[in-house]
Design a protein with these regions (language model features):
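Short, charged/polar N-terminal "headpieces" of proteins
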Residues: 1-19
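A structural detector for beta-sheet-dominated domains
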Residues: 12, 24-26, 80
């Protein structure tokens, strides 16, 4: 089972609401996690959102289910959407 690192992320959207999501990565690298968060936010039209280590912080490591491992092998990361995400 692939081990992944979970970064808990809270970002303010353009309309002012808070988006909560996790960034899953295969490498425990805080800067990479922030870059991945920015990439995903840009892809949904929220590229101006502030993402720093304050908004995106390491939470824990865990085993990855197959669909997550597949996405990480393909893209380097997986976004797990929680509150306020489109």
């Amino acid at each position: 089972v692939m081990e992944i690192h979970v970064y808990d992320t809270y970002v303010k959207a353009k309309d002012g609401h808070t988006m909560h999501f996790d960034v899953f990565t295969a490498v425990k690298d805080d800067q990479k996690a922030i870059e991945y968060a920015k990439q995903w936010l840009t892809s949904i039209g929220e590229g101006d959102a502030a993402v720093t280590s304050k908004e995106c912080s390491f939470c824990h490591s865990q085993g990855a289910p197959d669909n997550v491992a597949d996405a990480i092998n393909k893209d380097g990361y997986f976004i797990y959407k929680m509150e306020g995400c489109k």
